[in-house]
């Protein structure tokens, strides 16, 4: 499933990250609809507004269906046939839509049949792994692998307007397949646009964290076909819905557990072996206290760093570890990215405690 995302880029930067080629091969930037409704956040939850890509043909008659618009929409699809005056009274969860029942449930089948396909944009999404033998859950941040280019020497470049058409080598946004719908209040008022994220069985790399994952559209061709309802039929588009292995992840702090927390700390990598945020009792607690006294609290430049093999074998049962090795190259790029943003932006507010 997918119940929390990060999408923190400023509006103009997000626009450049979504540059594309139209059907004529021309490089373009998507237009915005209701741009003031977009609110960047490191910690987006259902019922908040998130940016989605969709075909311009949904809003402009006779437009080229390959042209794109970015529109902030409510996360959690409100069906067009919903009769209540308050969308929060919807009695079922539409945050996600399973791919194996998408053509069975009216809430999703109807808008899909109308071509209401969208691409949900995010830095990445969060998922929680249940820790065996405890009530704790470890959060992870999941995203596309990031590549450092020779041109930039980092993960940020193309800062000036004249360069956006030539290269975008900043953070690669995660592009998730979604369905949207339009709901009109029975008593009149503004139309509410809302969406759901399609989910599939997890790929092998994520199966230890959760058994479901978003349907990720990997690459420009997949994104174009999913959006272009004028040229690509529903049956053809659904062939794009499947798990992808082109994904990476790292453990993050429990700060993200509280959806009110909106700081870079939400997606910053943490080391599960070093952190040891565990609950224990009795003799287990005393063992953990002993381990804490034997481990240096701060790395000393004169003290050689211990390798993981130096940890006593019997203590491994008390140390949480990632089920799969994190790709440190990608995590390192993320840390550089966060460090640069921290230097450029005001200091974030102190996180709320869970």
UniProtKB/Swiss-Prot annotation:
Matches recorded under InterPro entries: SRAP, SRAP-like
Site (Required to stabilize abasic sites): 210
PTM annotation, UniProt: Ubiquitinated; the covalent HMCES DNA-protein cross-link is ubiquitinated, leading to its degradation by the proteasome.
This protein's domain notes: The N-terminal catalytic Cys-2 residue forms a thiazolidine linkage to a ring-opened DNA abasic site. Glu-127 catalyzes reversal of the thiazolidine linkage; self-reversal is favoured by duplex DNA formation. Glu-127 is also involved in sensing abasic sites in single-stranded DNA (ssDNA). His-210 stabilizes the abasic sites by forming a hydrogen bond with the O4' hydroxyl group.
Covalent link location (Glycyl lysine isopeptide (Lys-Gly) (interchain with G-Cter in SUMO2)): 148, 151, 276, 306, 339, 342
Coiled coil segments of this chain: none
Subunit text: Interacts (via PIP-box motif) with PCNA.
Any one GO cellular component localisation term in the record: replication fork
Description of activity control: Formation and reversal of DNA-protein cross-link depends on DNA context. Catalyzes formation of the thiazolidine linkage in presence of abasic sites in single-stranded DNA. Mediates the reversal of the thiazolidine cross-link in presence of double stranded DNA.
EC number(s) per entry: 4.-.-.-, 3.4.-.-
Region (Disordered): 292-354
Site feature: Required for sensing abasic sites: 127
Protein's recorded name: Abasic site processing protein HMCES
Family, as annotated: Belongs to the SOS response-associated peptidase family.
Gene3D superfamilies linked to this entry: SOS response associated peptidase-like (3.90.1680.10)
Role of this protein: Sensor of abasic sites in single-stranded DNA (ssDNA) required to preserve genome integrity by promoting error-free repair of abasic sites. Acts as an enzyme that recognizes and binds abasic sites in ssDNA at replication forks and chemically modifies the lesion by forming a covalent cross-link with DNA: forms a stable thiazolidine linkage between a ring-opened abasic site and the alpha-amino and sulfhydryl substituents of its N-terminal catalytic cysteine residue.
Basic and acidic residues composition bias: residue spans: 296-309, 337-348
Modified residues annotated as Phosphoserine in this record: 160, 295, 322
Main localization of the protein described in the UniProt heading: nucleus
Keywords: Autocatalytic cleavage, Chromosome, Covalent protein-DNA linkage, DNA damage, DNA-binding, Hydrolase, Isopeptide bond, Lyase, Phosphoprotein, Protease, Ubl conjugation
Active site positions: 2, 127
Location of the protein in the cell: Chromosome
Swiss-Prot/TrEMBL GO biological process terms: DNA damage response; interstrand cross-link repair; positive regulation of isotype switching; protein-DNA covalent cross-linking repair; proteolysis; somatic hypermutation of immunoglobulin genes
Alphabetized Pfam families for the sequence: SRAP
